[in-house]
């Protein structure tokens, strides 16, 4: 079981797996350190090399059935050296997604195919950050540290609960005395004393109950604030791939699950649990009164639990269905509001309404099923309660008639039994809330358990110069997706103006996303000033890279706030200078509120050209050393474009500029033009050089635009 093979896929596998965990790797350095004999990495050398990269690795034997429970991706190795990476197991369809190291492509294998390839040997791989992330996984255990943090408050709540239970114990005893002593002996003085005592107990009980609710709600509200803050910070720290692979409405629906958790934390469920914990005291007193009646109460508790357990899985499935339909509705609503101009322009409101009606009907039906099942569950609990009450009444009356129990004792017993049964019934009736909050925690965990962009230990430098290098880049968005960039080698010098052109889908925008470190390449390195971006702090990098897209989003704030978004305390003069460079100052000055004009949601109060010029000013205001125009002028009218192109010399001065454009006139003055086709660079040179070759793609595209 070694990696000796004439093609030696071990080193390549290590490169792929390291980059998956956002760890930079220099294959030549690894080969020099660990491939001492020059014949490839054996298993021991491979494990040592992986550990040197701060990866946690372990070679184990696993049956195919156990592969459902391991952390993926993992490296499957074979005796013949044809190792492959296992990236996903679909246990429902019995399919396996692997990365073929020989073909350098993902493959989907059926069960039989996988069984033929798999020999039971696998290397489990995780990064230290992954392990920390798993330990900090968001589920119900997340609240344990919060409880420990506020343990003083919870101890105070516990002490108050003890006193409340004691008061609850005293009241039935007073009633027993009244029934058995006061009424029989006509003891008015005793009655007055007991009445005063009951009034004092009632006042203290109400006060302590209110105090407990206040303390408990105060502490749970602080936990709620912490969770809400953590959620928003985590959401903004997620990689761009998370948002691109999910619908906006689905993400919003998951975030809104925080409301369910909040309601559960601040509701009566947890205080009911505290009340239930003290039930053993009541059981002791009740047993003293009547073991037979106590046994009836004891036997009823498993009935409550059994009924709740029976209902739970059905209720959970229906709640899952309700959530999924709600997420669909959220997504459709967000999509419809966002695309309202298109919907109205195409007069498709009736069709959209029909879709909404069907989805809404499905959601209401799912909600109705949940309500019906919850009602059945609650009525079942009520039925058990009534049955216990009838049995106790019948049996208690027999005991009173036979002289084994006094009337006062029977009344006191029933009051004590109510102190036990009431929280049990409340918990049983709140079981739906518990199921809902369980689903909410799971759904919210999809956001909070998703790994964020790594910042710890990343490279930060005071200021970049602007040299950019792509070395042997191969990239795809998902393991099972087609290759977007393949064998990209490109060097861009500091201060150079580069134009990138090509057909749609050729990989132009993807190239700039790698510069911004939105993604890590599957193979190769992206370097800025000689530093590997896989090791760079994303925030440090993005603060020094200005980006203008074709469709830029402005926030519902003033123009000055939008331009100075990265630094709200920026001097006004700096904002105005950037606006002048972008050709936006003149039209801003003509607005009634000038730079204090609120632009509306997504800049709806401005024209497309005005929004674009503000976006350009926003990109320029921090004086970035690298500036990216991704179809930035394609949506502009010719006058607006002329203003920007007239200032282009000043805009580009002292910066490395990358201009992506379909309109070739935008890039004709670039220092160098890169032509891309199907994820590869096929041509590069100046405008005239590329036009001189009649067989070139650039010449063909230029001819099309000239016509």
From Swiss-Prot:
Pfam families assigned: ABC_membrane, ABC_tran, Peptidase_C39
Domain ABC transporter stretches: 468-703
Recorded topology in the membrane: Multi-pass membrane protein
Residues covered by the Peptidase C39 domain: 2-125
Keywords: ATP-binding, Cell membrane, Cytolysis, Hemolysis, Hydrolase, Membrane, Nucleotide-binding, Transmembrane, Transmembrane helix, Transport
Transmembrane spans: 158-178, 191-211, 269-289, 295-315, 387-407
Compartments where found: Cell membrane
InterPro entries: AAA+_ATPase (IPR003593), ABC1_TM_dom (IPR011527), ABC1_TM_sf (IPR036640), ABC_transporter-like_ATP-bd (IPR003439), ABC_transporter-like_CS (IPR017871), ATPase_T1SS_HlyB (IPR010132), P-loop_NTPase (IPR027417), Peptidase_C39 (IPR005074)
GO molecular function: ABC-type oligopeptide transporter activity; ATP binding; ATP hydrolysis activity; peptidase activity
Residue intervals of the ABC transmembrane type-1 domain: 154-436
CDD domains cross-referenced by the UniProt entry: ABC_6TM_CyaB_HlyB_like, ABCC_Hemolysin, Peptidase_C39_likeA
NCBIfam families: type_I_sec_HlyB
Function: Involved in the export of hemolysin A.
Name assigned to this protein: Alpha-hemolysin translocation ATP-binding protein HlyB
Name of the coding gene: hlyB
């Amino acid at each position: 079981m070694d990696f000796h093979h004439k093609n030696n896929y071990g080193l390549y596998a290590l490169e792929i797996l390291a980059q998956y965990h956002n760890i930079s790797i220099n294959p030549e350095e690894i080969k020099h350190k660990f491939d001492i004999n020059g014949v490839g990495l054996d298993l021991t050398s491979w494990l040592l090399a992986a550990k040197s990269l701060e990866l946690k690795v372990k070679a184990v034997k696993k049956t195919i059935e156990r592969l459902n429970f391991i952390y993926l991706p993992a490296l499957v190795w074979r005796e013949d050296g044809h190792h492959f990476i296992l990236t996903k197991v679909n246990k429902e369809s019995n399919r396996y997604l692997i990365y073929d190291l020989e073909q350098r492509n993902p493959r989907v294998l059926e069960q039989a195919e996988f069984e033929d390839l798999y020999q039971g040997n696998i290397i489990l791989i995780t990064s230290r950050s992954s392990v920390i992330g798993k330990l900090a996984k968001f589920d119900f255990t997340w609240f344990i540290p919060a409880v420990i943090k506020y343990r003083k408050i919870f101890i105070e709540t516990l002490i108050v609960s003890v006193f409340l239970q004691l008061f609850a114990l005293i009241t039935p005893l007073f009633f027993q005395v009244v029934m058995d002593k006061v009424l029989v002996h006509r003891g008015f003085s005793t009655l007055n004393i007991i009445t005063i005592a009951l009034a004092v107990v009632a006042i203290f009980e109400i006060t302590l109950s209110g105090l407990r609710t206040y303390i408990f709600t105060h502490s749970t509200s602080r936990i709620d604030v912490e969770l809400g803050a953590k959620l928003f910070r985590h959401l903004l720290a997620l990689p761009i791939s998370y948002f691109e692979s999910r619908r906006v409405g689905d993400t919003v629906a998951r975030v809104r699950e925080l409301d369910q958790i909040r309601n559960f934390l601040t509701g009566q469920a947890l205080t009911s649990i505290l009340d239930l914990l003290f039930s053993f005291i009541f059981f002791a007193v009740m047993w003293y009164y009547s073991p037979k009646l106590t046994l009836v109460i004891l036997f009823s508790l498993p009935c409550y639990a059994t009924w709740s357990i029976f209902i739970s899985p059905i209720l959970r499935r229906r709640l899952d269905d309700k959530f999924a339909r709600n997420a669909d509705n959220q997504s459709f609503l967000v999509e419809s509001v966002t695309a309202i101009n298109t919907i109205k322009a195409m007069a498709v409101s009736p069709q959209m309404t029909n879709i909404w009606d069907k989805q809404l009907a499905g959601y209401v039906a799912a909600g109705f099923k949940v309500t019906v099942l919850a009602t059945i569950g609650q009525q079942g609990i009520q039925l058990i309660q009534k049955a216990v009450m009838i049995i106790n009444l019948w049996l208690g009356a027999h005991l009173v008639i036979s002289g084994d129990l006094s009337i006062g004792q029977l009344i006191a017993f029933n009051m004590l039994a109510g102190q036990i049964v009431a929280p049990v019934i409340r918990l049983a009736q709140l079981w739906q809330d518990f199921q809902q909050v369980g689903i909410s925690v799971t759904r919210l965990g999809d956001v909070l358990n998703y790994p964020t962009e790594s910042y710890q230990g990343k490279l930060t430098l005071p200021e970049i110069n602007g040299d950019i290098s792509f070395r042997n880049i191969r990239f795809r968005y998902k393991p099972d997706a087609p290759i977007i960039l393949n064998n990209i080698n490109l060097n861009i010098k500091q201060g150079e103006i580069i134009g990138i052109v090509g057909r749609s889908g050729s990989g132009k925008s993807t190239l700039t996303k790698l510069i911004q470190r939105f993604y890590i390449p599957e193979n190769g390195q992206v370097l800025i000033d000689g530093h590997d971006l896989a090791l760079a702090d994303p925030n440090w990098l993005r603060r020094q890279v200005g980006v203008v897209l074709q469709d830029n989003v402005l926030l519902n704030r003033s123009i000055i706030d939008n331009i100075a978004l990265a630094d709200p305390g920026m001097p006004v003069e700096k904002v105005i200078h950037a606006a002048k460079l972008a050709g936006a100052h003149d039209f801003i000055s003509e607005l009634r509120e000038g730079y204090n004009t609120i632009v509306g949601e997504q800049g709806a109060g401005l024209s497309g050209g005005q929004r674009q010029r503000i976006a350009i000013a926003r990109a320029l205001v921090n004086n970035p050393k690298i500036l990216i125009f991704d179809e930035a002028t394609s949506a502009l009218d010719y006058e607006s474009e002329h203003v920007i192109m007239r200032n282009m010399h000043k805009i580009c001065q002292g910066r490395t500029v990358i201009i992506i454009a379909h309109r070739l006139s935008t890039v004709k003055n670039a220092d160098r033009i890169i032509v891309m086709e199907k994820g590869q660079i096929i041509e590069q040179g100046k405008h005239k050089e590329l036009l001189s070759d009649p067989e070139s793609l650039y010449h063909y595209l230029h001819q099309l635009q000239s016509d």
